[in-house]
Curated annotation (Swiss-Prot):
UniProt-annotated binding residues for ATP: 10-15, 123, 132-133, 200
Species this protein is from: Shewanella baltica (strain OS155 / ATCC BAA-1091)
Residues given in the record as AMP binding sites: 31, 36, 57-59, 85-88, 92, 156, 167
PANTHER family: NUCLEOTIDE KINASE
GO biological process, one term: AMP salvage
Protein name (database record): Adenylate kinase
Coiled-coil features, chain-numbered ranges: none
Amino acid sequence: MRIILLGAPGAGKGTQAQFIMEQYGIPQISTGDMLRAAVKAGTPLGLEAKKVMDAGQLVSDDLIIGLVKERIAQEDCVKGFLLDGFPRTIPQADAMAANGISIDHVIEIDVPDEEIVKRMSGRRVHPGSGRVYHVVFNPPKVEGKDDVTGEDLAIRPDDEESTVRKRLAIYHEQTKPLVEYYGKVAAAGQTQYNKFDGTQSVAAVSEQLASVLK
């Protein structure tokens, strides 16, 4: 079972990825993890990627595709894999297809932008312990204070509303077109495409996913 998970940052992909991995015994493949592992192992592709990154440049799609092919040929991918954060663009999706990397299921978790902003910009963290709160969904007993120590809570830079909106804008510009792309691939009978409402409870989304991934 070869799966691509699409959705904006904060849509809940990580939670559902965990469910899919546990339920179906397939690994989650993240391009970041893959790059780090290849560089550490000193593989030919890893050495090439290190050279590019050391020069402060972006790793090319061809190099990433090479790493993906290398990774999915490993033993733990025999039953399939879950691609996380890749492809991000249509050229990357085209390159995957050109390299014979077929996908069985494309899953989109759809959450409106304003809901994502509410979810992410409402997070508060206690820097000392890493305890996480949410002003709406899991508020501290005293506003702005950690329940245990009474110390001030902070907003992580990634959760600042302006940062969240920037990340959403990049998603809509680069990755959202993949929804239409894979819709066409599915219409041609080459994959299955399913969209889920990510504003539902985690359990409801997992249940619907399981019914599609039988």
